[in-house]
């Protein structure tokens, strides 16, 4: 992604998270030229959005709607949400795995709209804008304690350190030191609170400094509002600063010996709250990280020793205990503790005793030094002095650590720009709020004021710069609350507090009462309420009640001169470094109070932030229990209100919920317009602005829903953006469907091509094994037996299992189960046949049986009806090894016997139309050892051990099946014994069918070549023929329309037949103009017979039906179309009679002037003859010879059932299917005669053999 450029000669563009590209050519302020648009790609890893990722896109703007959206996203582990350029973060209280290096890299160089909301997106935007626009940046992180501010600050530092580049060793060292400041400052500045286990108890503004190349060259840290009161006291279940527990638990033995370090339970300052451990925090490991961070920033061992010396001194100072002496004054109970403190601070123990128990006071008169008094302290005052010394040491030690870090992070090159990260603990409301909460909340009020001013100002500036009309939104400006606290005139809370401290400085109780009196002057302020012992300030985050007690003492925030003199007398140079100020005994001016320091720090911070371009992160804590998946709706709703998220959304949505630069808008949505895209490529040649207009026009977005600025598109409502995004998603969906359709079509094409190749190959070679079996049958007979004509058909195949006994399911399985055929036996042959059955006292007769040959047995299976149920059983089972011979005749009959020679059973005499095939399979099963006896008779054992002979005679009277009578078989003449099967007939031509449909692939295939099928007749590709009318005699060149008949009275009609004289006739009217020639009608044909289609490309017709002729083929088939259903198919020409269109009647000439009387026509004359109905023409004698087609006529004599459907031809060469016999009729209709002549012509060029079926 290229860097953006600033507008030439113009003001800076508004920048936030998103990257804005300025116009490349600035003339009238609008973009010119074709934008550089990246090709759109489908986001394959894009997750389905949960709720809305930008709160400005909410349909309903309310605190509850914001809360519901945040809750929904939180429950789906989406903790980040935008409000325009503001990031809202909800603390998950667990590791979601979203800060890995891979995630970090996914945000490098990305616009915020290209990636989901994330703190890395804020860091990327800040770094990008600093590097591209040379503007200082700052990231303001706000929220209450435990909301995740510190974590967000660390992640920003992590991202910037990763992407800022720089291979120089000094730059890498700066990065390491910047990252090392986190564990160091967290140890000294963070603590466990009730709401957060790692709560920052100070404010930090980290300023990262960069050179012109965007490489870090230094950093600077400014700290604010350290909660030093935590050093001396904590409430139950809270802890002191982390460093005290790290040091007492994991200090090396050297420090334990030097500084007397013991466990945290031994010190008052670490044991008062009875909380020593924190879940999820290893103090020992954290101590090692702290020491390592000290080493990284370059802290020497001597400096580290002094730091830990001061920590030890603070811990031992807390163990100093006081008791009342006889005078009621404070007395130290354990002098050894004081002695050890003096050893640590390198001061005199007597001075420590005096500083803790005696206060030196000085009186002054008229500006002159007065008397000096030593005033003993009571135990309460002594404890206060003790705690004040501990707090002062730790406060100054923390400042020294920050300064030491800054000295190590000092810039090592020229500073061009900076990025500031403000991490300050947020708004606090406790049951009891004091001076610390007032200062914290005051600083947060100042930050909120900056946020409102800069956010609103940025919106107003952008609308003005883009020349957009908008309506200002009312919002709460908290400037009045800031003035209530910080103003001097009229005096605010801080001014009243300082005045009370100056007026009654000696007595803290009197000072507090004075402060309460001063607050009465603020009662007229609508944001303030004064109550007994406390006052209420109406902050932007809610009303907070502050307790007055002790507030003046905390505001004084100064050490007694006795304590300053004590540390000033130290022999340790490091102590002097912590307390560099020399005590001026003559200085009578009031030192600055804590409120003065807070006010000055806050104003300096505001001034620093106003010099930078801000980014905002608003953190939210979902619950007070630090539970990972708990979302407290009430608590979050309260935070939403005091963070002002609803007002922020309203300001951001001040008329427009979405805005984007022209080029980015076009890059995102150019797919939605056919004029700006083609096949996913950007095709618009105009400017980005015109492209954006075209997209909005083609997507039918109403003009009132958007405005075009100078460089941006402004969309009014979120629903419009949702619609655009939905259309974009739908585009990818549609493209995916197209690709899938094309791919599926291509797969179908491949499958169809493979199927056709396979079909052709199987048609060519697939039946070879069956043909080989058929040839083996010829060899087995060896010219010894006459053949039946049907056995010699070229299409005859020895398929074997005709009943399907070897199949799973169907009637074949029933036969197998009924006959008890073992599953281990292979079925070689099955067919229906007959067996000669001898009955006592009756002549033998054939009976139907089922013959099954396996690799082991021959089964003769009978089917009987028993109790109205079909019973299938094996009548006889003959092992093939027991067969001695097969006896058959030399004629064409189907009878044969299986010679077994059994002593118990006779030999079976069988009849089977597929006898030769049975012989062949049996011979193969016997490995060629079959003894086939062929003679003029058939031998078999009619009874066990008694041979009989059956004669076979040729009887010309037998034209059908063989007949058996009295041991003689009568059969007709057959084909010569030397006959062999005819060649396999060529299949009839079929209409070409395209390989694919839908125009996705050409009929010729992916290569685009012409299909070979195109040469075949295709119904859709044939031109429609035109009917040619028969010529009529004396037909005029241009036919005239018939004259319109006008009804006349009866008298007039009668008069027209009367004889008239030769008087002059009345002139006839002129004839009407000739009409246009009618369009030629399409040829039709009438069905003479019923025809039932047998193939998918044939058309069924009924006798008398009229069909339209599409094309005629010379092979006896016409392509016709059913005019009712528009279905097309092939129909036999012989079944149709073409309807000849009658010639149009010529226009009758005009009537003559005088018509002679006509002679009446006899009733029984020519007219009557013409009206006579002609005799119907005889149907054709024979259908065209078409193998494989079933005919409709009267059925032939029922053949013997062989379980095979075949087109049996009679011996006379007929089709085997009778058609109506032709009657001798001298006159045939013209259409039928023409059809018969065409058929005869077509048949003359072919051999009229019986193999073409």
Swiss-Prot record:
Q: Where does the chain bind ATP?
A: 143-150
Where would I find the TH1 domain in this sequence? 787-977
Q: Name one GO cellular component term.
A: actin cortical patch
Quote the PTM field: Phosphorylation of the TEDS site (Ser-371) is required for the polarization of the actin cytoskeleton. Phosphorylation probably activates the myosin-I ATPase activity.
Q: Does the keyword rRNA-binding apply?
A: no
Q: What are the GO MF terms of this UniProt record? A: actin filament binding; Arp2/3 complex binding; ATP binding; hydrolase activity; microfilament motor activity
Pro residues biased stretches: 1068-1081, 1143-1155
Does GTP-binding count among this protein's keywords? no
- State the coiled-coil residue ranges: none
Q: Where is the SH3 domain?
A: 1080-1141
For the region Disordered, give the residue spans: 1-40, 959-1083, 1139-1253
Actin-binding: annotated segments: 418-500
Q: Which keywords does this chain's UniProt record carry?
A: Actin-binding, ATP-binding, Cytoplasm, Cytoskeleton, Hydrolase, Motor protein, Myosin, Nucleotide-binding, Phosphoprotein, Repeat, SH3 domain
Residue stretches making up the IQ domain: 733-753, 754-779
Q: What does this protein do?
A: Type-I myosin implicated in the organization of the actin cytoskeleton. Required for proper actin cytoskeleton polarization. At the cell cortex, assembles in patch-like structures together with proteins from the actin-polymerizing machinery and promotes actin assembly. Functions as actin nucleation-promoting factor (NPF) for the Arp2/3 complex. Plays an important role in polarized growth, spore germination, hyphal morphogenesis, and septal wall formation.
Domain comment from the record reads as follows: The myosin motor domain displays actin-stimulated ATPase activity and generates a mechanochemical force.
Q: What is the protein named?
A: Myosin-1
Species for this entry: Aspergillus clavatus (strain ATCC 1007 / CBS 513.65 / DSM 816 / NCTC 3887 / NRRL 1 / QM 1276 / 107)
Gene designation per UniProt: myoA
């Amino acid at each position: 992604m290229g860097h953006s450029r600033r507008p030439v000669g113009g003001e800076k563009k508004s920048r936030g998270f998103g990257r804005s590209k300025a116009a490349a050519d600035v003339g009238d302020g609008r973009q010119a030229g074709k934008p550089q648009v990246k090709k759109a790609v489908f986001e394959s890893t894009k997750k389905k959005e949960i709720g809305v990722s930008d709160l400005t896109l909410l349909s309903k703007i309310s605190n509850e709607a914001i809360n519901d959206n945040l809750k929904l996203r939180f429950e789906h582990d989406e903790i980040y949400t935008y409000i325009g350029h503001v990031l809202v973060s909800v603390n998950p209280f667990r590791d979601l795995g979203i800060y890995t290096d891979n995630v970090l890299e996914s945000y490098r160089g990305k616009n915020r709209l290209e990636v989901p909301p994330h703190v890395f997106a804020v860091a990327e935007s800040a770094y990008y804008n600093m590097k591209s626009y040379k503007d200082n940046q700052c990231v303001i992180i706000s929220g209450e304690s435990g909301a995740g501010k510190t974590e967000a600050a660390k992640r920003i530092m992590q991202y910037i350190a990763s992407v800022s580049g720089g291979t120089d060793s000094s730059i890498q060292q700066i990065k390491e030191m910047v990252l090392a400041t986190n564990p160091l400052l967290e140890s000294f500045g963070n603590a466990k609170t009730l709401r957060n286990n790692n709560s920052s108890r100070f404010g930090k503004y980290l300023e990262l400094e960069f050179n012109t190349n965007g490489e870090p060259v230094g950093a600077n840290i400014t700290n604010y509002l350290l909660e030093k009161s935590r050093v001396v006291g904590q409430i139950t279940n809270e802890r002191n600063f982390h460093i005290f527990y790290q040091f007492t638990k994991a200090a090396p033995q050297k420090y334990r010996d030097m500084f007397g370090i013991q466990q945290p339970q031994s010190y008052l300052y670490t044991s008062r709250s009875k909380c020593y451990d924190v879940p999820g925090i290893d103090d020992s490991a954290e101590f090692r990280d702290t020491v390592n961070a000290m080493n990284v920033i370059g802290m020497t061992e001597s400096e580290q020793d002094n730091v830990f010396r001061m920590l030890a001194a603070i811990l031992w100072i807390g163990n100093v205990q006081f008791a009342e002496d006889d005078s009621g004054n404070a007395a130290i109970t354990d002098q050894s503790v004081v002695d050890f403190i003096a050893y640590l601070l390198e001061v005199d123990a007597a001075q420590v005793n005096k500083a803790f128990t005696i206060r030196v006071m000085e009186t002054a008169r008229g500006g002159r030094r007065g008397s000096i008094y030593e005033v003993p302290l009571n135990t309460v005052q002594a404890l206060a002095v003790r705690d004040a010394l501990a707090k002062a040491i730790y406060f100054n030690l923390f400042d020294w650590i920050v300064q030491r870090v800054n000295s190590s992070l000092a810039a090592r090159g020229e500073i061009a720009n900076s990025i500031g990260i403000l991490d300050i603990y947020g708004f606090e409301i406790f049951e009891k709020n004091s001076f610390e909460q007032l200062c914290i909340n005051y600083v947060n009020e100042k930050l909120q004021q900056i946020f409102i001013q800069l956010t609103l100002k940025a919106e107003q500036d952008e609308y003005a710069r883009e020349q957009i009309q908008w309506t200002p939104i009312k919002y709460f400006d908290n400037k009045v609350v800031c003035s209530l606290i910080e103003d001097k005139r009229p005096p605010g809370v801080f001014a009243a507090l300082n005045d009370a401290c100056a007026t009654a400085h000696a007595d803290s109780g009197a000072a507090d009462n004075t402060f309460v009196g001063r607050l009465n002057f603020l009662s007229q302020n609508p944001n303030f309420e004064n109550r007994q012992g406390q006052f209420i300030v109406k902050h932007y985050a809610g009303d907070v009640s502050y307790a007055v007690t002790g507030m003046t003492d905390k505001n004084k925030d100064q050490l007694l001169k006795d304590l300053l003199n004590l540390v000033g007398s130290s022999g340790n140079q490091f102590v002097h470094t912590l307390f560099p100020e020399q005590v001026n005994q003559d200085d009578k001016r009031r030192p600055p109070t804590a409120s003065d320091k807070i006010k000055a720090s806050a104003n300096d911070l505001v001034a620093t932030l106003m010099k930078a371009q801000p980014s905002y992160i608003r953190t939210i804590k979902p619950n007070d229990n630090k539970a990972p998946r708990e979302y407290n709706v009430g608590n979050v709703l309260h935070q939403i209100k005091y963070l002002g998220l609803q007002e922020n959304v309203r300001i951001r949505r001040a008329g427009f919920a979405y805005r984007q630069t022209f080029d980015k808008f076009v890059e995102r949505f150019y797919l939605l317009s056919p004029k700006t895209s083609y096949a996913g490529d950007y095709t618009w040649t105009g400017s980005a602005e015109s492209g954006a207009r075209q997209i909005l026009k083609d997507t039918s977005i109403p003009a009132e829903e958007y405005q075009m600025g100078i460089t941006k598109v402004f969309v009014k409502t979120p629903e419009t953006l949702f619609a655009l995004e939905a259309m974009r998603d739908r585009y990818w969906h549609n493209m995916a469907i197209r690709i899938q359709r094309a791919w599926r079509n291509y797969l179908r094409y491949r499958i169809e091509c493979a199927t056709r190749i396979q079909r052709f190959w199987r048609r060519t070679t697939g039946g070879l094994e069956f043909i080989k079996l058929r040839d083996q049958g010829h060899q087995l007979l060896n010219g010894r037996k006459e053949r039946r004509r049907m056995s010699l058909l070229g299409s005859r195949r020895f398929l074997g299992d005709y009943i399907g006994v070897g199949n799973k399911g169907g009637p074949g399985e029933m036969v197998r189960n009924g006959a008890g055929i073992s599953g281990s036996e292979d079925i070689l042959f099955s067919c229906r046949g007959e067996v000669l059955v001898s009955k006592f006292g009756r002549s033998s007769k054939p009976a139907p049986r089922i013959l099954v040959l396996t690799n082991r047995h021959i089964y003769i299976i009978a089917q009987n009806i028993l109790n109205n149920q079909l019973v299938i059983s094996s009548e006889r089972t003959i092992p093939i090894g027991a067969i001695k011979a097969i006896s058959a005749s030399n004629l064409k009959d189907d009878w044969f016997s299986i010679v077994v020679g059994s002593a118990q059973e006779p030999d079976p005499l069988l009849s089977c139309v597929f006898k030769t095939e049975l012989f062949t399979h049996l011979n193969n099963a016997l490995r060629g050892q079959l003894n086939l006896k062929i003679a003029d008779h058939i031998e078999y054992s009619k009874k066990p051990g008694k041979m009989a002979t059956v004669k076979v005679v040729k009887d010309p009277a037998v034209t059908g099946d063989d007949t058996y009578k009295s041991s003689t078989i009568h059969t007709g003449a057959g084909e010569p014994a030397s006959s062999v099967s005819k060649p396999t007939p060529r299949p009839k031509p079929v209409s070409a069918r395209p390989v694919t449909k839908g125009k996705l692939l050409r009929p010729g295939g992916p290569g685009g070549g012409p299909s070979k099928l195109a040469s075949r007749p295709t119904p859709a590709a044939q031109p429609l023929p035109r009917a040619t009318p028969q010529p009529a005699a004396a037909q005029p060149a241009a036919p005239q329309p018939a004259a319109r008949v006008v009804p006349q009275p009866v008298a007039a009609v009668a008069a027209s037949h009367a004889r008239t004289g030769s008087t002059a006739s009345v002139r006839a009217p002129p004839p009407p103009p000739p009409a246009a020639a009618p369009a030629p009608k399409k040829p039709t044909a009438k069905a003479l017979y019923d025809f039932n289609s047998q193939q998918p490309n044939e058309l069924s017709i009924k006798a008398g039906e009229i069909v339209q002729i599409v094309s005629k083929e010379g092979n006896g088939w016409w392509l016709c179309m059913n005019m009712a259903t528009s279905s097309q198919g092939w129909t036999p020409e012989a079944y149709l009679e073409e309807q000849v269109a009658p010639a149009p009647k010529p226009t009758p000439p005009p009537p003559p002037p005088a018509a002679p009387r006509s002679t009446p026509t006899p009733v029984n004359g020519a007219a009557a003859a013409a009206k006579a109905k002609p005799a119907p023409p005889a149907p054709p004698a024979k259908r065209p010879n078409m193998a494989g087609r079933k005919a409709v006529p009267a059925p032939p004599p029922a053949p013997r059932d062989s379980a095979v459907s075949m087109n049996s031809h009679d011996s006379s060469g007929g089709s085997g299917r009778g058609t109506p016999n032709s009657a001798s009729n001298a006159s045939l209709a013209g259409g039928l005669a023409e059809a018969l002549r065409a058929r005869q012509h077509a048949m003359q060029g072919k051999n009229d053999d019986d193999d073409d079926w």
